[in-house]
A protein has these predicted regions:
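Structured lumen-facing ectodomains of secretory-pathway proteins
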Residues: 1-167
Length: 167
């Protein structure tokens, strides 16, 4: 009986036909990581084994910039310095994960959060990342939720440039 969707792992022999698997309530090895936007918690996938620090190394509240773009250098340059000292949110796609993070850091980001552009989680490869600022990923649906609660920032003509908030 399972009445909720959650992160789980099922291995052999429990995954074989005609077998019975029992879930354990003791978890000595996996603790979920999350950040908060508004009143909601969002889990993320930490990218480890590269030069980047964990997201938890930047404690406290930070403002963020949420762009609808892929996190190219041009996307971040167009923010005209607004990213300085903030966390960057950008979409998966168009450029490699390390290029997104490198570009965000170049324009002042203290961390980069990549939201998936399709359902499911991302296992990012940051092999060529040369910075220490954190870079993590979140689900597409979580990216959409964060975008929806973020405040739009517009130019003088009313065109949306990006969205912002605090986490």
């Amino acid at each position: 009986y399972d009445d909720g969707v959650n992160l789980d792992t099922l291995g052999s022999p429990g995954s074989y036909a005609n077998s019975l698997a029992i879930a354990s309530v003791d978890n000595a090895g996996f603790t979920g990581t999350y950040f908060q936007v508004g009143q909601r918690m969002f889990s993320y996938t930490e990218t480890t084994g590269y030069s980047n620090e964990p997201l938890a190394t930047i404690p406290g509240e930070y403002d963020y910039i949420f762009i609808d773009g892929f996190g190219t250098e041009e996307d971040f340059a167009a923010l005209n310095g607004a990213l300085e000292g903030k966390i960057a949110f950008c979409s998966r796609g168009s450029t490699s994960f390390y290029q997104k993070a490198e570009a965000a850091v170049k324009y002042g980001a203290v961390a980069t959060i990549v939201y998936n552009n399709q359902p499911g989680s991302i296992n990012m490869d940051l092999s060529d990342y040369t910075q220490s600022q954190p870079c993590v990923s979140i689900l597409q649906s979580d990216g959409a939720r964060i975008r929806s609660v973020s405040e739009p920032v517009t130019d003088d003509g009313g065109q949306e440039l990006y969205r912002t908030g605090t986490m």
